[in-house]
Swiss-Prot record:
Residues 1-30, 83-124 are annotated as: Disordered. It holds the Pfam family Homeodomain. PROSITE patterns: HOMEOBOX_1, HOMEOBOX_2. Gene3D superfamilies: Homeodomain-like. The lineage of its organism: Eukaryota, Metazoa, Chordata, Craniata, Vertebrata. This is Homeobox protein CHOX-7. GO terms for cellular component: nucleus. It comes from Gallus gallus. It is found in: Nucleus.
């Protein structure tokens, strides 16, 4: 099941380009639109694949299981970003994050209320 929530295995480890790391790291896979369509369809049904499902999809799409695994891994990451709302909506307006707007409703007012006090006392 989707219990391994740590870092992925060596397959997920991609050294930054130009770092000289990564022993002959594989080229970026160019998926065909048919493959992407199928992968997206599967992802729409379930966010996590069993080993059997993964191997069946890999065979059906003539991909390696690692490719299917990594695609799902990346797709889940993208899905979580979108779900968290860090992605602009269609109108191009950035999504307002209510958590940021109302960080501390009382904080600023209490500060403002505290400042005039000494002046009032001086004027009294």
């Amino acid at each position: 099941g989707p219990k391994g929530k740590g870092k992925g295995g060596p397959a997920a480890e991609q050294p930054p380009p130009g770092s000289g790391a990564g022993k002959s790291r594989r080229r970026r896979t160019a998926f065909t639109s048919e493959q992407l369509l199928e992968l997206e369809k599967e992802f729409h049904c379930k966010k996590y694949l069993s080993l059997t499902e993964r191997s069946q999809i890999a065979h059906a799409l003539k991909l390696s299981e690692v490719q299917v695994k990594i695609w799902f891994q990346n797709r889940r990451a993208k899905w979580k970003r979108i779900k968290a709302g860090n992605v602009s909506n269609r109108s191009g307006e950035p999504v307002r994050n209510p958590k940021i707007v109302r960080a501390h409703p009382g904080a600023r007012q209490s500060l403002r209320r505290a400042q005039p006090a000494p002046a009032d006392r001086a004027g009294a």
